[in-house]
Amino acid sequence: MDSSTWSPPATATAEPLQAYERIRNAADISVIVIYFVVVMAVGLWAMFSTNRGTVGGFFLAGRSMVWWPIGASLFASNIGSGHFVGLAGTGAAAGIATGGFEWNALILVVLLGWVFVPIYIKAGVVTMPEYLRKRFGGQRIQVYLSVLSLVLYIFTKISADIFSGAIFINLALGLDLYLAIFILLAITALYTITGGLAAVIYTDTLQTVIMLLGSFILTGFAFHEVGGYSAFVTKYMNAIPTVTSYGNTTVKKECYTPRADSFHIFRDPLKGDLPWPGLIFGLTIISLWYWCTDQVIVQRCLSAKNMSHVKAGCIMCGYMKLLPMFLMVMPGMISRILFTEKVACTVPSECEKYCGTKVGCTNIAYPTLVVELMPNGLRGLMLSVMLASLMSSLTSIFNSASTLFTMDIYTKIRKKASEKELMIAGRLFMLVLIGVSIAWVPIVQSAQSGQLFDYIQSITSYLGPPIAAVFLLAIFCKRVNEPGAFWGLIIGFLIGVSRMITEFAYGTGSCMEPSNCPTIICGVHYLYFAIILFVITIIVILAISLFTKPIADVHLYRLCWSLRNSKEERIDLDAEDEDIQDAREDALEIDTEASEEKKGCLRQAYDMFCGLDQQKGPKMTKEEEAAMKLKMTDTSEKRLWRMVVNINGIILLAVAVFCHAYFA
């Protein structure tokens, strides 16, 4: 059927105000209000029922989490509004291949639970840079990696999530983009700054349920509207806009026609927009950084009761990662069928009219579907879903970023900072992070032909591979030492950042107006660039390590895969830093004893709300401290549960292979 019957003039020329009017009904507003009340209630319950008055309680939820909130939180931390907007947008523009990004994670979560987390737990660490400090000694890698991780959070995660959430609110409520951002962040910051990791994980679990429920309903509506799966395939290939020329310029056919390989995940290695070797190897490298070495993800696993709960949480997350292809990518493609003129626009003036940016409007595919297709009440639910995904991602990132700053950077500046000072510093840092992220939003708006998901993946391809290389070699190659790891990170970063800056300087261009960036720099697909950068970093690390002094095994017990089960006592390379930490804790005790004066009611309420009332239990003896440390670094599992999670892990890998093969 010709696509023109699927783009009614009324919707094609709809202004945001009409969409805004649609939300103005009792059912939608009630659902949104109820949603916010429930989320705040869960956040407040977690806030008052968990220990947030210590660094371990605020940042690691006291290592008491069971598998299902961990699985839900892993999924919710990963799936932000950037996925709803970005995956659906790239799906509308180029077909199902972008779903391969999600399915790749099925393999990586197994690696995370079975290989990486056991090492991190045995090392007894809270942050990823802290692991590298124990593994290599010295402080420069730890500080460098903390700063780089924070830069990545700002450039990719926070900016993209804020931008995509604001697109949705702008379309649905008619609010100014930056006012929408401000309101969102105010609510998000409130319970992250006050609540700590337990509040984040419990609200994530609630929001995962809402997110899946809402997107299942929308997918059902979308497929019903388009006439089922086979009609969807036919109609998508015919979803071509009618306006394809302006002035004396006619748009090239490939700019507005759906790709011939739209329904294949694996695409041509040279001409494909997502070449299959890049999707298999390049994406796995980026995913290794994201899933196995990134603070946001690993922190959830480190909060688990024991290893079986870690693995079960990873499996649960893996199964849920099957869904975005059907709940986000395909609805985005259906949005192109139903609202072709708007979503598939190619003429710059038309695009600017519909979504305020000249490079393309595919980013509004999912929000448009929600606003135009859903009945009253359900539309409010879907707006709540978008807010849920945005806020769950932001809360996760804010909590993890403040952990990195507090534990890895602030403690270097203020070596004798009290626990209370660390808690306040972490919370204040979140406010700085928010400000910088908002300033970056306009750049996100115009990058990668207006395709948000491509922007996120390209930035991680330029900055992530060196980190992945260092962690991989740190765990599997005990010969690697500090000079090798440090210079590998620095050289890898310089190569990646030079590509990133060049691309931003020239602009990524669009199908209509290609970028003038030199082919030798920007002509290499970002997934291929990730492979090249990863290999160069590994060569540099190994070469420098082999020419410099190795680290003795006594410093590496339980920090490398080959020495993971050793029972000998490890002499940490950062033992001096540990002494400073102990001295700080002793000073803290003296400090708290000295300041036991009676506080007023207002001060007590303030401390309780912000989690600054350190719950003081009886002081532990040295033997009790040693037993506690043993519990925190224990990776043992009951035989039955180990078998159950192992069998499920194998099934998950088989499902991943089947999905890739079926849609190849």
UniProtKB/Swiss-Prot annotation:
- Which InterPro entries does the entry link to? Na/Glc_symporter_sf, Na/solute_symporter, Na/solute_symporter_CS
Q: Which reaction does it catalyse?
A: D-glucose(out) + 2 Na(+)(out) = D-glucose(in) + 2 Na(+)(in); D-galactose(out) + 2 Na(+)(out) = D-galactose(in) + 2 Na(+)(in)
Q: Which parts of the sequence bind D-glucose?
A: 457
| Cystine residue pairs | 255-511, 255-610, 345-351, 355-361, 517-522
> Which residue numbers mark the site Implicated in sodium coupling?
43, 300
Modulation of this protein's activity:
Enhanced by the interaction with PDZK1IP1/MAP17; but unlike SLC5A2/SGLT2, PDZK1IP1 is not essential for SLC5A1 transporter activity. Possibly modulated by cholesterol binding.
How is it placed in the membrane, per its record? Multi-pass membrane protein
GO: which molecular function terms? alpha-glucoside transmembrane transporter activity; D-glucose:sodium symporter activity; galactose:sodium symporter activity; water transmembrane transporter activity
Single GO BP term: transepithelial water transport
Q: Which residue ranges traverse the bilayer?
A: 25-47, 67-90, 96-117, 140-169, 177-193, 203-221, 276-295, 310-331, 376-406, 423-444, 452-477, 482-504, 526-547, 645-662
Q: Kindly provide the PTM information from the record.
A: N-glycosylation is not necessary for the cotransporter function.
Q: Does the keyword Cell wall biogenesis/degradation apply?
A: no
PROSITE patterns found in the cross-reference section: NA_SOLUT_SYMP_1 (PS00456), NA_SOLUT_SYMP_2 (PS00457), NA_SOLUT_SYMP_3 (PS50283)
Record topology, Extracellular segments? 1-24, 91-95, 170-176, 222-275, 332-375, 445-451, 505-525, 663-664
Tell me one Pfam family matched here.
Answer: SSF
Q: Which UniProt keywords apply?
A: Cell membrane, Disulfide bond, Glycoprotein, Ion transport, Membrane, Sodium, Sodium transport, Sugar transport, Symport, Transmembrane, Transmembrane helix, Transport
Q: Enumerate the residues marked as the site Involved in sugar-binding/transport and inhibitor binding.
A: 460
Q: Which GO terms describe its cellular component?
A: apical plasma membrane; early endosome; Golgi apparatus; nuclear membrane; perinuclear region of cytoplasm
Physiological role: Electrogenic Na(+)-coupled sugar symporter that actively transports D-glucose or D-galactose at the plasma membrane, with a Na(+) to sugar coupling ratio of 2:1. Transporter activity is driven by a transmembrane Na(+) electrochemical gradient set by the Na(+)/K(+) pump. Has a primary role in the transport of dietary monosaccharides from enterocytes to blood. Responsible for the absorption of D-glucose or D-galactose across the apical brush-border membrane of enterocytes, whereas basolateral exit is provided by GLUT2.
> Which PANTHER family does the UniProt entry name for this protein?
SODIUM_GLUCOSE COTRANSPORTER 1, SOLUTE CARRIER FAMILY 5
State the family named in the UniProt similarity comment for this chain.
Belongs to the sodium:solute symporter (SSF) (TC 2.A.21) family.
Cite the domain annotation text: The cholesterol-binding site is formed by transmembrane helices TM1, TM7 and TM13.
Protein name in the entry:
Sodium/glucose cotransporter 1
Organism in which the protein naturally occurs: Ovis aries
Specify the taxonomic lineage.
Answer: Eukaryota, Metazoa, Chordata, Craniata, Vertebrata
Q: Which gene encodes it?
A: SLC5A1
